[in-house]
């Protein structure tokens, strides 16, 4: 978060209403931009489906397939997220950047092999057609790389790079979806699912290019990070169970009395999902205010206090 704080402190030093609005706007875009863009993608695709005259069942199935794929990929990558972040912090501190990019490909390999096998089995019994299943599996593989790349880009504080990668993915998805459905007459469900997959594929390429810009390619072992996973195994399970805690209630609600079976193993709960999305949007202002208060007001005092311990401060200054 230090990268955000540095930019915010520069913006908040400027006086005037426009400067304040710009500072809050920057914090909002950086902190909530990817989440907002994800919501925008879902809502925008539903609007385009409505314009294309798609059946309500196809619209619900598209939302379920994309949601299931995103949540499944996020859950798989959450196991490595915290240990990899610790590995990155140690390597950057020790100035061993040559080990970072190989670890990215090594972690991707393990996540893709295990994740695609598990999600592929789910898709076989999910009731999806062969084309729908292949597109979902393709999107799942891309999102594993995307979530993993975001952990690496966050470590180097390239929040703008992450945001612009999301913007590019959304724009390409909308543009390609419109081209396929309205101009070429492709099937609505498969056309939009393909457009979303291509959009997130472009996002994956952009994030990979950003990583190559920051870190050198080398012949270091791609499995070095596994020592950190073994050493900090509780962190791995913390990340996994935190993610399960965030999203397990969705599965319970989808399988509960208010859930509806969209198709096969794909379930949804419109009476819950829509209010939940609105509730999520309502807390964004609080999230932005929290980030601003922590980075601009709290963090400078926190850093000054602990620097007294690390840099030989006297007792009088500390107390």
Give, region by region, the residue ranges found by the protein language model.
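N-terminal membrane topogenesis motif
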Residues: 1-41, 60, 64, 223-235
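Membrane-water interface segments that mark the loop-to-transmembrane alpha-helix transition
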Residues: 23-31, 80-120, 315-319
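Small-residue-rich midsections of specific transmembrane alpha-helices
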Residues: 63-89, 243, 247, 276-299
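Alpha-helical transmembrane segments of multi-pass membrane proteins
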Residues: 67-72, 108-113, 121-153
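Hydrophobic alpha-helical transmembrane segments
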Residues: 165-212
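Transmembrane helical elements of multi-pass membrane transporters/channels
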Residues: 195-295
């Amino acid at each position: 978060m230090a990268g955000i704080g540095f930019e915010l402190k520069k913006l908040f030093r400027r006086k005037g209403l426009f400067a304040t609005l710009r500072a809050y706007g920057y914090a909002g875009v950086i902190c909530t931009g990817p989440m907002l863009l994800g919501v925008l993608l879902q809502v925008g695709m539903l609007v385009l489906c409505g314009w294309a005259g798609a059946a309500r069942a196809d619209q619900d199935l598209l939302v379920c397939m994309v949601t299931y794929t995103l949540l499944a990929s996020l859950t798989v990558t959450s196991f490595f997220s915290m240990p990899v972040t610790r590995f990155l912090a140690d390597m950057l501190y020790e100035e061993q950047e040559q080990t970072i990019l190989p670890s990215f490909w090594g972690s991707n390999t393990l996540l893709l092999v295990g994740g695609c096998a598990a999600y592929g089995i789910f898709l076989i019994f999910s009731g999806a057609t062969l084309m729908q299943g292949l597109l979902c599996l393709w999107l799942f593989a891309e999102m594993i790389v995307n979530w993993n790349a975001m952990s690496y880009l966050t470590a180097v504080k390239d929040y703008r790079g992450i945001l612009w990668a999301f913007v590019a993915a959304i724009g390409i998805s909308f543009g390609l979806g419109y081209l396929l459905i309205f101009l070429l007459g492709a099937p609505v469900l498969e056309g939009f699912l393909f457009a979303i997959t291509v959009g997130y594929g472009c996002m994956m390429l952009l994030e990979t290019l950003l990583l190559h810009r920051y870190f050198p390619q080398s012949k270091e072992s791609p499995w070095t990070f596994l020592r950190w996973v073994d050493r900090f195994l509780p962190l791995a399970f913390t990340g996994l169970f935190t993610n399960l805690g965030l999203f397990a209630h969705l599965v319970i609600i989808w399988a509960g009395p208010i859930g509806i079976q969209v198709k096969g193993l794909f379930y949804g709960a419109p009476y819950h999902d829509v209010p939940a999305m609105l509730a999520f949007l309502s807390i964004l202002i609080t999230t932005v205010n929290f980030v601003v208060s922590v980075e601009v007001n709290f963090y400078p005092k926190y850093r000054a206090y602990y620097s007294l311990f690390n840099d030989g401060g006297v007792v009088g200054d500390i107390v």
